[in-house]
Amino acid sequence: MRAEKQYTRNEVEETIVRWKKLKESGATEHDNTEYAQLCDVLRSAQSEIEARRDLKGHIKRCFSSVDKNTEKLILKQQVLAYKKLSQNLPAPDDCILSVLLRLSKDEQLLQSIVKQPLQNSKVDGKVRRDFGSCQITPSAKQQRKYLQYQISEDDAIKNRMFRRMSDLESYPAVMRDVAELKDDNERLNLDTIKRNALVELKKLRLIKQQESLRHQVMHCQPHLRTIVNAVERMSCRRPKLVPQATRLTEVLERQQRSDRERRLKQKQCDYLQTVCAHGREINVRTKNAQARAQKANRAVLAYHSHIEKEEQRRAERNAKQRLQALKENDEEAYLKLIDQAKDTRITHLLRQTDHYLDSLAAAVKVQQSQFGESAYDEDMDRRMNPEDDRKIDYYNVAHNIREVVTEQPSILVGGKLKEYQLRGLQWMISLYNNHLNGILADEMGLGKTIQTISLITHLIEKKRQNGPFLVIVPLSTLTNWTMEFERWAPSIVKIVYKGPPQVRKALHPQVRHSNFQVLLTTYEYIIKDRPLLSRIKWIYMIIDEGHRMKNTQSKLTNTLTTYYSSRYRLILTGTPLQNNLPELWALLNFVLPRIFNSIKSFDEWFNTPFANTGGQDKMELTEEESLLVIRRLHKVLRPFLLRRLKKDVEAELPDKVEKVIRCQMSGLQQKLYYQMKKHGMLYVEDAKRGKTGIKGLQNTVMQLKKICNHPFVFEDVERSIDPTGFNYDMLWRVSGKFELLDRILPKLFRSGHRILMFFQMTQIMNIMEDYLHYRQWRYLRLDGSTKADDRSKLLGVFNDPTAEVNLFLLSTRAGGLGLNLQTADTVIIFDSDWNPHQDLQAQDRAHRIGQTKEVRIYRLITEKSVEENILARAQYKLDIDGKVIQAGKFDNKSTPEEREAFLRSLLENENGEEENDEKGELDDDELNEILARGDDELRLFKQMTEDLERESPYGKNKEKERLIQVSELPEFYQREEPEKTTDLLQEEPLGRGARRRTPVVYDEAVRDAQWMAEMDMESEARPTRGRPKRNIASVDETPALTLNGKPKKKRGPAPDTLTSEHRSLLRRVCLEIYKAVNELEDDNGRPLNKLFLELPSKKLYPDYYMIIKSPIALDAIRKHINGTFYKTLEAMKSDLMTMFNNARTYNEEGSFVYEDANKMQTAMETKIEELEEDGTLATLRGMEAEATSQLEDRIENEA
C-alpha cells in the first residue's frame, strides 16, 4: 500500500479555495475530474481527523476507568515487597500476585486499545508504529510459569547432587587391585579418577554448611544498609532482659529520695525569702531617708544656682558696660566700673600699664632735657588741668608747646596743601617744638613726601633752620623725591648724592663745606660713604620707607645709631606694623631711644602682662583685657605716631576694588607640581642623558611658586616641551595665569584701561616680555636692575596721556615704592608677596591722591596650590596690622615645631578650602562681569569672547583645549611615576639663546648690595626670543654679581691629595657614621634628624646666626663626604660635634632638640666603637699616617 501524500497548511488552504471556486462554477464529480479528486482528498483528511479524535477519547476513557483505591493497594504491596527484598528475604506471594494481576490488567487494556478498529488506514498505520515500538512486559501467567520453572530447576539440581553423592559413595574404597591388571597408563588414569571422585564427594557433602553460611550472610546484609536500618529500626532492636522486681525497687527508691530533697530545698527557700523580705524593708526605709535628704539638697542647690546666675548676669552686664566704655574711649567711666567690679586681673593690668605710662612720661622729660631746659611746665599744666587726668597729662608732656599752623610756607610753591596735610605739618612742628621725634605713618598715597617737604620749608622759613637736612630714601624712590623737591621747593639748595664713585667724589667738597640745605641719598650710600656723611651734624634725619628699620640688628640701623648724629629724627612709613609688635618697637626705639629703650619692658607691659603669675600655662587675655591693652598702646603711640587712612581724609578718592581670580593649572603644571611636592625635584627627559632630574631645587615652596607662575622658568622643561623655541602659543598654553591674561588683556586694552602688572620674579617678567612681543603689544618694564635715570623716563612715558603704552611691568619690591602712576586704573598682582604690605604699596601706585577713576585690583592665584596658603598667611598679617596689637599673637616666640608645622601646612594639598564667590574656574561670562565697569563694557567683552571662540583654534569642542592637557605632553610626563634617575642636571645660566636667565635674589640686604654694584658697572643688554623690542623702556640686566661688585669667577674642584684606596675607605667609614646619625629614631618612630638636615632660615631665625659662630648641618656634611673636603676622619667627627654643640647652645637644656643632639652624639660614638672593634679604623689610621708622612716628605723636598 503506497503512502499517502502529506499536505502542508498552505496546500490545504489552496485546495479548499480551488474546491470552492469549482463548486461555485457548477462543477460536479461526474462531469469534472479535478473536482472529483479534490472531493476525495478532503474526505480523506476529514476521516483522518475524526479517527484521531476517536482514538484520543478511547484512550482517555480506558485510563480514567482505573480505580484509585486499587492503585493505593498496589503501592502498599510494592512497599512491603521492597522491604522484604532489601533484607534479602523472599517477597510474599500475595504481593507478587497483586503486581502480576495489575500487569495483566494493563496488558489487557493496551491490547484493547491496540485492537480498537481504526477506520483510516493512515491513522491505523501510525498507531501501530507508535505501539509497535513499545516493549510490552510479560504477562502474569508467564511470570508464574517462570517462577515454577525456577523452583523445579532447583529441585532437579538438588536431586542430581544427591544422586551423584550416592554414586560416589558406591564406588569401591580400594581400586588398586583392579588397577594391577592394567598397564601403567591405565593405572595412572585410575589413580587420578579416584582422587577426583573423592574431592568431588567432599565438596558435595559441604552443601549444608554452604546453605548455612549463605543464610547468615543474607541475614547480616540488611544491617549494613543505612536506608533500610532507618526504616526498620524496630526490627533491629534487641530486647533487654531486666528483672521487673529490681527495676520497680529502684524507681521507688529514687522517688523517695527526690521527695526528701524537695522538702529540704523548700525549707531553705522559705528561710531565704524571709531574710530577703527583711532586707527589702530596710532598703525601703533607707531610700526614703535618702530621698528626703536629696530633696533638701536640691532645694539648696537651686537656691545657690539662682543666686549665682543673678550674679553672673550682673557681672556680664557690668562687663558689657565696661567694654562699651572702652570702645567709646571713656576711660573715666571705665575706671568707675572697674572699682565696682573689683576684677583683680584688670586692676593689675591697669596698674601695670599706668606704671609704664608714668615711666614713659618721665622718659619724655629726659628726652626733651637733652636739648636744654625741658619744654614741659608742670605748674602750668597743673593750673590748666586741676583734675588728675593721666591721659591729658601724658599727651601734654609730649605736646606741651602747641603751635597752630594755618597756612603753608611761602617757599612751598608746587601747589596748595590739603587740610589733613596741614594738620600733619602742625603735628610735626609740635614734635619739633617739644624736642621729640616721631613716625608719620599715613596710608600710602596720602602725600607723606609733600608733608615732609612742607616741614623742611617751614623750618627754613619760620624757624630759621637752614639745615643741613638728611633725607634717606630707597633707590627706587630717589628720582621721585628729586622731582617733588624741584616741583614744590625749587628754592631749596639740595644735593642728590648718588651715582658712580667719580660722581660722588665730585660732590665731596660741597658736602664738606655744607653748601646745601638738603642732602638726598639712599640707604646704600649711608653705609658706603659713612666716613664723609657721618661727620656732619644734621638738624633733621628723615628716613623714607622706614619699615626697613624694623630689624634693630641690621647694618643700616647700627650705622645710623652708632655713627650719625642728628637733633631730630623722622620716619616715614605706610606700614608701621607689618608683622608683630617688636618691629613697631624697633621703629620707636630708633626715633626715641631714651623713651623706648627696652624691648623687654615693652613686651612685658603690652604683650605678656600675666606671664610671671606663677602658673605653668600661659594665661590668655579676654576680649576686654585685649581691648584695654590696645587702648593703652594707642595712648603710648598717640604722641609719637600719626596715621591717617584714605577713607578718613579723602572722601573724593575713588573706590579701590580687589578681586581674587583663581586660575586652573595646565596639564604640565599639574605634573611638575606633583613631582616637586612628592619627590622634591623635577624630572625631565634629555636626548643625550635620558631621564634626568633638575638639580639645585632646594627651597620647595619657592619652586612650587615658580611652577604655579610658569613652567618655562625651568629651562630644561621648556626644551622638552618646545624644542624648537618657536611655538609661541606654548607661552600661554602651559600656564594657567598666562592663559587667563591672554583672555583679559585684549579686553582691557580695547576698553582703554591702563594696567600696572606686578611680579615677584624677574624670570617671569622675561617670559612675559616674550609673550608681549608675540602678541605685538607695547609695554614698559621696571625692575631692580633699572637705572635711576631710566626710572624717571619710564614714569614720564607712562604718565603721558598721548602715549600708546597701556601696560607697565614692574617688580613688586623695586616698583612698589615711591612711584606716582595715577594714570593707571587697573593693577594686576601676578603673584602675591609673603608680606602683604608690599602688595598694598604696589596697589597704591595707582590708588593715590589725584586718581579720578575707580581702581580695580586683580590678584591671580593658582587654584589648589601653595599660593592659596600664602594668601591666607598674608591676610593674617593684615589682621594684626588692623588691630595694631593682639594679645598672645605677637610674642615672636614660636617654637621650631610650630614653624615646621606651618611649612608643612603650605605643602599639604588636602587642606580645607574656603567658600568664596571667586573660587574655582571662572567661565567667560563670570570673567566679563568681573572685568566690566559698565553695561557698555560688558556688551563689548561678550562680543570679544564670541569672536575669540569663533576664530581661535583652541577651546572647548575643538581639537585642543586652551590649556595644554596631559595627553599633549611628551610620553615621559604622561607616566604616573617617573623612572628613577641616575643623573642630575645642573641648571645652566643661559637658555636656548633666546632669553638670559638672571638669578633672582630674594634677600633684601643682598639686593641692596647688588643695586650698589650695578651703579658702578655697565650692564649688558638682555636678549629675548628674537623679536626686536618696540619701546624705549627696555632695561638692561647684569650678570650675577658678588657683594663687592665683581663678577663671579668659576673655580674648578681642588685636586684630591689622597689615594683612591684611602679616599674610598675614608668615604665608606664616614658614610656609615653619617647613616647611624641620620637614620636615628626615637621610641615613637620620630626621626631625630629633622631639624639637623638643613640650616635654619635667616629670616625666621636671625638670632641663630648671631649666637652660633660656625653653623653647619647634615646636608653640608654629606656634601663634604661625597667630595674631597675631608682628609681625615677627625675632620668629619669635628663637624658633627660642632653641629651637636650648636644645637645645645641655641636651645635650652631639657628641650627635645637638646636631647636629640645628645642621642645623635651617642649614636655616633657607638658606631665609632663598632668600627674600632672590627679593625676598620686601625686600617684607616694606618693610611692616614702614611699620607701624612708622604705630605711631609713632599713639603721638605719643595723646601
Swiss-Prot record:
The Helicase ATP-binding domain extends over 429-594
- Give its E.C. classification number: 3.6.4.-
SMART domains, per database record: BROMO, DEXDc, HELICc, HSA, SnAC
GO CC: one term? nucleus
| Top EC class of this enzyme | hydrolase
**InterPro entries from the xrefs?**
Bromodomain (IPR001487), Bromodomain-like_sf (IPR036427), Bromodomain_CS (IPR018359), Helicase_ATP-bd (IPR014001), Helicase_C-like (IPR001650), HSA_dom (IPR014012), P-loop_NTPase (IPR027417), SnAC (IPR029295)
In this chain, ATP is annotated as bound at: 442-449
Biological process (GO) annotations? chromatin remodeling; heterochromatin boundary formation; mitotic sister chromatid cohesion; positive regulation of transcription by RNA polymerase II; transcription initiation-coupled chromatin remodeling
**Which molecular-function annotation in GO is an example for this chain?**
chromatin-protein adaptor activity
Q: Relate the protein's function as given in its record.
A: Helicase. Component of the chromatin structure remodeling complex (RSC), which is involved in transcription regulation and nucleosome positioning. Controls particularly membrane and organelle development genes.
Homology family:
Belongs to the SNF2/RAD54 helicase family.
Q: What PANTHER family does this protein map onto?
A: SNF2/RAD54 HELICASE FAMILY (PTHR10799)
Tell me the protein's name.
Answer: Chromatin structure-remodeling complex subunit snf21
Native source organism of the sequence: Schizosaccharomyces pombe (strain 972 / ATCC 24843) (Fission yeast)
Organism lineage reads as:
Eukaryota, Fungi, Dikarya, Ascomycota, Taphrinomycotina
